[in-house]
Amino acid sequence: MVSPRAPAEHARAHDGPDSRVQPEIPAAAGRMLGLPEMRLVTYDRRGHRRLGAILDGRVVDLPDAVGHPAFPATLEAFVQSSRGTVLDAARAALARPDVKDHVVKRARVLPPLFPRSLLLPTSPESLSPTEGSGLERRVIGPEQDVPWPSEAAWLDYEPKVAAVLGLETTDVDTEAVAERIFGYTLVSDWVAKDASGDPVGTSDGVPIAIGPCVVTIDGCDPQAMFLQAKVDGSELAKGNLNGSARSLFGLIAAASRGTVLERGDAFALGPFPARDDDPNRRLWPGALVELAAEGIGTLRNRLGPRP
């Protein structure tokens, strides 16, 4: 289980041409499961992480919109208390006419959350109780550059969808996993390779990109989710999650055997088969990588130069 590491500090919000959020996040994507959907982000408020929600393509400060001093100020805290009145208060605030008074101008979006832990197997079959144990990976957000590891000849790219738990979970069946999930987000995972294609360095050498938002389960049907991955504008892979969603549920069920999974734990799985012989998976410095999903938006990152 990977323990994501937050950056030591965050740059302050910068000026921009308008108040629209920089990453591409849909203003609305329908109400798939009958409840008002929420697309939750974290933005930089004077150097601190702050909970926001997307409304008409803009960031709304959710704690200010709710107006209660006990309402969570971060997405991590929101996940920990994401049942009953907290969810109701958030939805009610976003539905009020005066919610536009709380739109954040020139919002700079950060990684939406730092999961308590993040399991990143290459496939459900590769899951083991100790996979990733004790390792730390730095987390970056949308529109941030990926620092190039000094030992890498090239990077392998693994686009993934992550489910964030909203309830404590133990010994759960696959069929019961969906109701325990808080929401979904996108993950771009990278593996440093040498010239012969073998992994090099440590697994914490390349940060994980997460974002651009977390969509709550009431606004997202994972089995119907359509994803597309691009490199420098050219399509790398696309497809519907379909069976991959059930594989993700199975991954969580397997991880819950004999242990307690906590709120805020996240599990990510790639919907596209890995092919080591695919030259398009070899990424080089300067490549622009985009992972898009209906209802979530586009996670966009550029690979940095060689050090």
Question: Positions of the model-derived regions?
Answer:
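Short strand-turn-strand beta-turns centered on an Asx-Gly dipeptide
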Residues: 55, 231-233, 270, 294
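N-terminal non-catalytic cap/leader segment that marks the start of a structured domain
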Residues: 20-129, 288-292, 307
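A conserved acidic, glycine/proline-rich C-terminal tail/linker
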Residues: 25-30, 37, 247-284
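Short, charged beta-turn/beta-strand-edge "cap" motif at the junction between a beta-strand
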Residues: 46-48, 125-127, 168-170, 272-276, ...
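Generic structural signal for buried aliphatic residues
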Residues: 161, 267-268, 289
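Short hydrophobic alpha-helical segments enriched in small aliphatic residues
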Residues: 11, 15-16
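Glycine-enriched loop-and-adjacent helix/strand subsegments that border the catalytic/binding cleft
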Residues: 110-253, 258
